[in-house]
């Protein structure tokens, strides 16, 4: 029993000695190349990395961000991306409105919401593959 205990203590002592450098200073391991905790950019891989790089360039390749609101006039309509030549659009019309007015938006000239008159325009959108 005592020999088993001494063997365990000896193994722990050897492990502690291996952890220290040649001058008795404890060796440290870091995950990042410069030391410390890596940033999100250093750690991201795959699709997450592609999205982060695109976001740094100001792009939104997977339509994750909310659409940019325009004034909704005929000269400055709200742009609606679509992969086809028509798309169904919902307009809330007023901030405190609890119903959504749905209507079809076709490619070409800007169209108005039948209820409030806000202008929308369909723009072509290429999906990222």
UniProtKB/Swiss-Prot annotation:
GO biological process: mitochondrial electron transport, cytochrome c to oxygen; response to peptide hormone; response to thyroid hormone
MF terms (GO), sorted A to Z: cytochrome-c oxidase activity; metal ion binding
Classification via CDD domains: Cyt_c_Oxidase_Vb (cd00924)
N6-acetyllysine: residues carrying this PTM: 68, 86, 121
Cellular compartment(s): Mitochondrion inner membrane
Record pathway: Energy metabolism; oxidative phosphorylation
GO CC field: mitochondrial inner membrane; mitochondrial membrane; mitochondrion; respiratory chain complex IV
Membrane topology value: Peripheral membrane protein
PROSITE patterns: COX5B_1, COX5B_2
Residue span of the annotated presequence: 1-31
Subunit structure: Component of the cytochrome c oxidase (complex IV, CIV), a multisubunit enzyme composed of 14 subunits. The complex is composed of a catalytic core of 3 subunits MT-CO1, MT-CO2 and MT-CO3, encoded in the mitochondrial DNA, and 11 supernumerary subunits COX4I, COX5A, COX5B, COX6A, COX6B, COX6C, COX7A, COX7B, COX7C, COX8 and NDUFA4, which are encoded in the nuclear genome.
Family membership: Belongs to the cytochrome c oxidase subunit 5B family.
Protein name per Swiss-Prot or TrEMBL: Cytochrome c oxidase subunit 5B, mitochondrial
Organism, as annotated: Rattus norvegicus
